[in-house]
Amino acid sequence: MCIRDSDGTTTEYPAVDFSTVGVKAVDDHTLTYTLNFDFPGFLSLLSYAPYEPAYGPLLEEFADQFCTSAETACSCGAFYLAEYTPLENWVMKKNPENYDADSVYIDTVRYIYNQEELISGPEMVKRGEIDQATISSDILDSWLADDTTKDMVSMERPETGKSYFYIFNFLPYRHEFSNWTVTGVDAQYEPDNWAKAINSTNFRRAFLYAINPSVTLAVTAPEGYDNYKLHTITPPSFCANSKGVDYTECGGLANLSDFFDEAKAKEYRDAAVEELTAAGVTFPIKIQYPYNPAVVDWDKQCQVFKQQVEAVLNDGFDFISIIITQGPSDNFLNAVRRVGAYQLMSYYWGADYSDPETEVYPFYQEAGDRGT
């Protein structure tokens, strides 16, 4: 079998016996997959967009433009989009053509855009205008103390599909990628000084051991935050092995716990001071730490983080100065994170399917990829 490459050359490959292929069409509506290793996340993988069945005639018609827009895609889910008005509402209707339509018991789902909810959501819940809202830490105590509202309050379940962590900017300068421009941090945050510091292993380890996650988690989960702690990039209850053991309890992961250790933090800080002083770094090292004002309590988490970490690392030496900055409430991703307008930032990643490998995507970058 010969395959023509994009440069016009051809490559010859040996013929493949189709009986060895691990995918079989049993009938018009059934595929059988045969795996050559245990993969507990395989079923969730099949629900990921690239693995959804493709409608053959449409694929042939659009070729490499297939699924590049709403007009070139085709699917047959439980609901279809019946109405859509930007910044007003959208309506989903039950799809009678779905293969399992008899098991869909809701006929219509209506989403209504409500700008007011971002500002006065809790009061709208009181009035019965909306079903739920996020309560900021400013009013949580008063709601819990009020007999008319205390039973309305409940903690959100831990988000098992997302991993939360802190990220550093190792290249705080303007840089032109083929498909993206990184502006970097402003001169007032001393990017040259920062670049030397962040590329020091001792500096980064000082941060690792200085962060007490319980302090920042207590801002948004004062009723109990142990279930929200992460000790690795894979959240608990996200996936399990073929024997049903949670991935975070497998192998060496089972022994991971909080890294917070003041003595170790100061040990690495002192080593970093000696190393960085020799490299010409000036202290305190400025660290821009932006937040999105549209996210409830993010600003308060930043304040608590700053106080807690500086209390550890600045004990006995003026080591760092964390400078909290407010980003835009709209388009924060492109305006701050993707253009590198930060030195330290809180970050999260949502996996595409139940495989721990998907949690590592933010930590590497394909050639030509602008990053996340």
What are these regions (language model features)?
Residues 1-3, 92:
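Short, small-residue-biased leader/transition segments that mark boundaries at the very start
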Residues 4-19, 196-205, 209, 213, ...:
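Extracytoplasmic/peripheral linker and loop segments enriched in polar/acidic and small residues
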Residues 8-12, 16-19, 29, 35-110:
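Gly/Pro-rich hinge or "lid" segments in bacterial periplasmic/extracellular proteins
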Residues 31, 77-79, 90-91, 107-112, ...:
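Short, well-ordered beta-strand elements
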Residues 48, 97-144, 160:
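Ligand-site clamp/hinge motif
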Residues 93, 194-313:
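Append "and occasionally in soluble cytosolic enzymes with long acidic Gly/Pro-rich linkers
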Residues 93-97, 115, 162-202, 219:
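A bilobed periplasmic-binding-protein/Venus flytrap-type ligand-binding module shared by bacterial periplasmic
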Residues 125-126, 130-135, 147-153, 308-372:
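Periplasmic binding protein-like
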